[in-house]
């Protein structure tokens, strides 16, 4: 029996009770024992004298009845009409486009989360309205539920269809061909499961709150008990998430990726040249480099490869790297890497690149390969590992390690570099991608600190990067957030694709060049907790070239959409999302300023980098 039928049955019982006479003892004049007992009772206050007294049973039947309390199981599954309207509206808004294409599984996840948020907002709105209206909750009529079901059917179908159209447009914009219709079909089921799970968790927390409040009410007042209960439950939720669940997740991730760090990628072999760490004469054993360190050291273009591209005599590039197992802390790793770099002759090369890795210790091969090709092999690159966790986990746990590693490595290199005679110093460059740019920035206090180098290249900077945010927030009036202009581009500039130009066009860019590469569709660049409650400029202003013009900001919804984009930011073709492989050729060319390369040469190098990547 559904809830509407139960309410109708209750009304029938009320009508039957109205026709029943009261007990004989409740009728005036029928009490035995004399006139005193049989005399009519005084009329209640507000009731005219002589008016017939309403029997208690009838009065009870005619009085407004509160909604019947369901059983414990039904209470867990019980939903309110205002909450359902909120879930419907907010859930349907989740189909609006975000930065990247998403399959049915991710759409179902976002749908379920946002619907649960909408349900909570609907319940909260109804509670506030009742508080101002000074009325109790009432069961909705059958026709109200009927109207909701009809509206839900229409809205879900329309939203689902529009969502598929928008996803098609995004895939077309980025050149994504993969599409699994099965995932789309199961998305409503996933959404329902996520919604029910969140709803049950919320009901469980509500039950815990009530139990704590009742327990405390034995010793303190009701209002105080409720307030303390809220504090207790909120604190418990925080401790469980930040303590038990978070640390448990990190420990499991550490255990899993620490094992992976001991492996070596297929096709990578220990270097046989003394110009690489882990090779003959190196101070750093091959086994201590870690998986990504061995990949960085064991790959890259040879002198012959570079000569084929430049058609000039080339040098064998130098690479130095220290893994987590190479030393006990970041400072020791940096000192060891610089010692090995000096042994290899890195400070005698014309160009020296300091790279801060991503969370896993990864150095984008497109970055270093482009640097080595464009410098004719007269280059040395040094880096250290500070974690073996992927960047999306390192965002949560390794931000301080990234800053420490970036500062330690640059300080160690700069300390040795500054001891050389000015005429014998290599040109010093700094680079980093994603969390590596966050760590790379840590060694500098601002644009003038960065200008100590010959050039800087950061790709896909996270939104929380200190200097990136400073430059973007103080951009020149009229420049959009997706491509800001800072102080007329005197030192710092931003570009989506350097091959198409680095604004502002026509302005001088002398001395040190600091270039940030960022795609309008890169969720790493734009994700921020502020998306929950405030609209960012990159949405309110004109969109970038690979973002749909129909994207707009919705409280709560946009935050979860961009959050869901993060793990898949590298799963799109180059030139979009968090994939910068082909942009590194033109980025390095912009910062290095090597002579003699034509646009055809750069196009040829982009093909080489794409092939080798």
Name what the model sees in each region.
Residues 1-72:
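Actinobacteria-biased recognition of intrinsically disordered, low-complexity terminal regions
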Residues 437-448:
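Short glycine-enriched nucleophile-adjacent loop
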Residues 2-5, 435, 523:
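Conformational gate/switch positions in structured elements
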Residues 430-437:
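Gly/Ala-rich beta-loop-alpha elbow adjacent to hydrolase catalytic centers
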